[in-house]
């Protein structure tokens, strides 16, 4: 039987091809734009923050104030490190060109490493160790971010050393678990080893759950799954608010600090995605989607998203992309793209390439690194979102 194709049929085929071609071209153009923005943001970070003194370290902010430390604290450094890691995953040779820079960041990162601590375990101090500084108290959340970055690098490269360091960090973090049953809401991982704080935070528990789940996926060791469940359950019991979002922290008397930061919503999204992956229980995926929906609605009101620090939003959006890798809902990528577009147009100084998202004349390393991460990840192929936090 012969098939007859009418003129209108031919036109329909040509039109569909044209639409597909236009869509593909638009996606490619968007990726190129994000790629260029990531590179420009990184170049500004290096130009204004990187210390060309052989230390492999950075400034805390630009312009520096007279009383500033010589180098940045560990948390900002780690985000510059992660920004560089994200750049190595840009398509083609562009990503590969950042491998020497990533090696440089790895050297700098180790200047914060301390072989001892309050719980007897090694980890990253909050400030560089001698000869670059005198170290500082360990923060469990700061260490968790590095652990998650090491997992990302392991998934990208298979480097066994990064996996080994992630395991060390996890051991440190769970050593910070509150074991005093006389405390209000006993349990939970403390925020820091510093003597001036005894808070147990969403951000010192949920990222550890995320790290534990990643380690369980890689090793199959139920030790990691057990701790992930323990920290997840404690946070849900004590810091999950009636609006479906998470409060910041709880003190030893049971008083709750009820600020709802964006990164404290993003990480639980990622944790639930990983629980779904390791258990196959769709309840976890539904929880992830519910938190994401509630967060996007909450931060979409009253310009709230732009009152959140960029370095909280980068973590928030990366976890939404991890959710997208599981449910294929592109609204998360669209929301991240819209945020990136607005920050680029509204809060960036085109003369310097620096961001001023808080309206001040100073740019922090945290801020610049966060926006570099956002543009870099948006330039990735969407199938790569599954390696994010």
Regions found by a protein language model. Name each.
Residues 26-28:
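Boundary at the C-terminal end of the N-terminal hydrophobic targeting segment
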Residues 202-208, 212-216, 223-272:
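Active-site cradle of extracellular carbohydrate-active enzymes
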Residues 88, 92, 154-158, 216-220, ...:
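Short coil/turn linking the two alpha-helices of tandem helical-hairpin repeats
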Residues 99-218, 226:
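Extended ligand-binding groove/face enriched in aromatic
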Residues 1-11:
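Bacterial N-terminal signal peptides that target proteins for export
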Residues 30-83, 87-141, 200, 260, ...:
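CBM-like carbohydrate-recognition segments
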Residues 9-19:
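Bacterial N-terminal signal peptides
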């Amino acid at each position: 039987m012969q098939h007859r194709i009418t003129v209108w049929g031919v036109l329909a085929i040509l039109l569909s091809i044209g639409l597909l071609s236009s869509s593909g071209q638009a996606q490619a153009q968007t990726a190129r734009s994000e790629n260029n923005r990531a590179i420009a943001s990184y170049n500004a970070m290096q130009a204004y923050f990187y210390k060309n003194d052989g230390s492999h370290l950075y400034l805390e902010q630009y312009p520096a104030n007279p009383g500033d430390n010589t180098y940045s604290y560990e948390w900002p450094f780690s985000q510059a490190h992660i920004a560089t890691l994200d750049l190595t995953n840009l398509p083609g040779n562009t990503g590969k060109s950042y491998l020497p820079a990533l090696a440089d960041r790895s050297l700098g990162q180790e200047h914060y490493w301390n072989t001892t601590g309050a719980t007897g375990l090694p980890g990253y101090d909050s400030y560089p160790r001698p000869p670059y500084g005198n170290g500082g108290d360990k923060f469990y959340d700061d260490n968790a971010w590095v652990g998650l970055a090491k997992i990302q690098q392991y998934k990208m490269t298979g480097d066994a050393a990064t996996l080994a360091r992630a395991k060390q960090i996890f051991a440190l973090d769970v050593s910070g678990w509150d074991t005093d049953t006389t405390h209000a809401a006993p349990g939970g991982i403390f925020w820091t080893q510093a003597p001036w704080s005894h808070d147990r935070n969403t951000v010192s528990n949920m990222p550890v759950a995320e790290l534990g789940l990643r380690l369980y996926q890689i090793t199959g060791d139920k030790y990691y799954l057990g701790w992930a469940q323990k920290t997840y359950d404690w946070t849900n019991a004590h810091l999950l608010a009636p609006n479906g979002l998470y409060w910041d922290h709880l003190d030893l008397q049971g008083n709750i600090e009820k600020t709802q930061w964006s990164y404290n919503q993003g990480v639980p999204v990622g944790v639930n995605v990983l629980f779904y992956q390791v258990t196959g229980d769709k309840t976890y995926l539904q929880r992830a989607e519910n938190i994401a929906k509630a967060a996007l609605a909450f931060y979409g009101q009253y310009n709230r998203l732009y009152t959140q620090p960029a370095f909280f939003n980068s973590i928030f959006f990366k976890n939404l992309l991890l959710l997208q890798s599981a449910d294929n809902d592109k609204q998360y990528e669209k929301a991240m793209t819209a945020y990136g577009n607005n920050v680029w147009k509204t809060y960036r100084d085109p003369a310097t390439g620096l961001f001023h998202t808080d309206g001040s004349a100073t740019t922090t390393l945290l801020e610049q690194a966060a926006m570099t991460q956002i543009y870099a990840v948006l330039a990735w192929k969407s199938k790569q979102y599954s390696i994010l936090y």
